[in-house]
Amino acid sequence: MKFSVLVLLASYLVGVNSSIVDTSEELICPDPENPLDCYPKLFVPTNEWQTIKPGQDIPPGLHVRLNIDTLEKEAKLMSADEKDEPVQEVVVGGELQDHSREAITENLQKLHESKHPEVKQEHAHRTKVSQGDLSNFDAACSEIESFKPHESDVERLHLALDTLEELSHDIEFGVKLTSDKAIFQSLVNIANGASDPKITEKVYRVMGSSLRNNPEAISNILTNFDKSYVDNLFEQLANENDVLQKRILGIIQALVQNSHFVRQYFSFDHSSGLNDLIAIFPKLGPNSKSRASNILEDLQLFPVTNDRRSLEDQDPESQVSKFIQNSFVGNKLDEKNFKSYFDQLVNLHQSNKSLRPSGDFLNWLAEEVESRKENKKRDDYSQEDKDFDEYMLRARHEVFGNPMGLRKAIADEL
């Protein structure tokens, strides 16, 4: 949730025993092929706020905050008079006391309710639920983990999810939530079994918020869970409404920020996630289609074109169509995915007549159709192959080109 103010939720103190790192030797290079895009492993503080980059070690005794607008952690040197100044961040200058964590939670709840009165009103209606014992992270997690369908108090579940959704925007709470496999698995179970879509949406919001721009939290999920977690997300996509689809895709979009996850699920060499996203796209709602096209854009599997037409055309269906076309033009698809991707592209253009094929794709399609004529000479040329070759020929003219050209093409075949 985006606030207009900066709120520090840094409820921890960096350990005083952190090792000193030689910055001349210890560098972090996100892109091994770009040595200029490196930064020191040890964060070097100044008197000005600086963003703490992924993987950096932080020296002890700094003033640390979370920028809620950018969801980035920042730090600077602690000034002598800073403790007496009325600031909008909570400064952690020593060991964290229990009441400090409670104060952070309480202030965060008040800030949220002041900006969203409907939340405060909704909570007021739940008179039978004690809010005090579910307003902190540990109590909310305990309620989630012990929840039993048809037995536990659903109103208490709502309160616990509200607390976690609020706190999960903070990077440290996101890390803490994802580091406990039992709690996160409980969230998965609740989402899969809930009959109330409001509960399901809250669960997905908690998951998405805890992972967004939080590399350590993402790493926790990738370590603690197996492929079934990702498979389950895509399975739920087909059965949910647009709101829930968008929430689920928000989780997937957070995960694709991890290069290891992308290589395993969203590369052309390991394309199970990519294939699922393309296959499910026609079943998505309008908002979810936008989120799906954003995921494809985030992957950066193809060079970004800055021509005027590309910049002006941001329609999700057009973006997905271009992605599939580029997959063919770039010869990225293996034999297993070739037919399914082509079928998806044909269906997409048949359902949306405003979509236009690119010149590069039309040239590729013409060459592909011509080259497939040689298949007839093969001894192992099956009826299935023949049917698909004819399907491509018809699609070339009826879907992507001039339908009248099909007559001439068939005549040439004869």
From Swiss-Prot:
One Gene Ontology biological process: protein transport
Alphabetical list of Gene3D superfamilies matching this protein: Leucine-rich Repeat Variant (1.25.10.10)
Domain of life: Eukaryota
UniProt keyword annotations, A-Z: Endoplasmic reticulum, Glycoprotein, Protein transport, Signal, Translocation, Transport
Cited PROSITE patterns: ER_TARGET (PS00014)
One CC-aspect GO term: endoplasmic reticulum lumen
Pfam annotation, one family: SIL1
GO molecular function: adenyl-nucleotide exchange factor activity
Localization in the cell: Endoplasmic reticulum lumen
Primary residence: endoplasmic reticulum
InterPro entries: ARM-like, ARM-type_fold, Hsp70_NEF-Inhibitors, Sil1_fungi
Signal peptide interval: 1-18
Positions glycosylated per UniProt: N17, N352
Quaternary structure note: Interacts with KAR2.
Entry-linked PANTHER family: NUCLEOTIDE EXCHANGE FACTOR SIL1 (PTHR19316:SF34), PROTEIN FOLDING REGULATOR (PTHR19316)
Function: Required for protein translocation and folding in the endoplasmic reticulum (ER). Functions as a nucleotide exchange factor for the ER lumenal chaperone KAR2.
Family: Belongs to the SIL1 family.
Protein name: Nucleotide exchange factor SIL1
Species annotation: Candida albicans (strain SC5314 / ATCC MYA-2876) (Yeast)
Gene that encodes it: SIL1
